[in-house]
Curated annotation (Swiss-Prot):
InterPro entries: RNA_pol_sigma_r3/r4-like. To B.subtilis pcf and to sigma factors. It comes from the Bacteria. This is Uncharacterized protein YqaQ. SUPFAM superfamilies: Sigma3 and sigma4 domains of RNA polymerase sigma factors.
């Protein structure tokens, strides 16, 4: 990964975590689709025959395809979130770690500089330093298995 891709990955962390939580709720949680919520019926509607409560094969197949797609996306984001979280351990220097954490939260350079009481240019230089550390360590490539292995 190049420097810009690593920076984008760190900046994307905050929304990827939210998406991982959402996908986990959908795939593993007790999320009930609104169309399956029961609605009380009265009068003639209550006595009329209802359709089959089961789903057709096409609906089941489509649901499986959707769940498979969501599962793949979940794994993709989980790998990236994990890599970004472990990246914090590879960074040296307390201010570098604070800047890294602030970037993970989606803070802008301006907000980080106000938070730390330093200039935006200093924040940018320090960001470049720790991204260089991560590039030299090949941290993200190893965790994300982006390099192709020779067979």
């Amino acid at each position: 990964m190049n420097r810009k891709e690593i920076e984008n990955l760190i900046n994307s962390y905050h929304w990827m975590v939210k998406e991982v939580r959402r996908l986990q709720r959908v795939l593993y949680g007790s999320v009930i689709p609104m169309k399956n919520w029961g609605v009380a019926q009265y009068g003639l509607e209550a006595t009329m025959p209802k359709g089959s409560p089961g789903k057709s094969q096409a609906e089941l197949r489509q649901m499986d395809m959707r769940e498979e797609r969501l599962f793949k996306r979940l794994k993709y984001y989980e790998e990236r979130v994990y890599a970004v979280e472990l990246g914090a351990e590879k960074i040296h220097g307390e201010q570098h770690k604070v800047i890294y954490d602030c970037m993970m939260e989606g803070m802008s350079y301006r907000a980080i500089s106000l938070h730390l009481g330093i200039s935006r240019e200093t924040v940018r230089k320090m960001k470049d330093e720790f991204i260089s550390q991560l590039c030299q360590d090949c941290h993200f490539e190893r965790l994300l298995n982006l390099k192709k292995s020779v067979v």
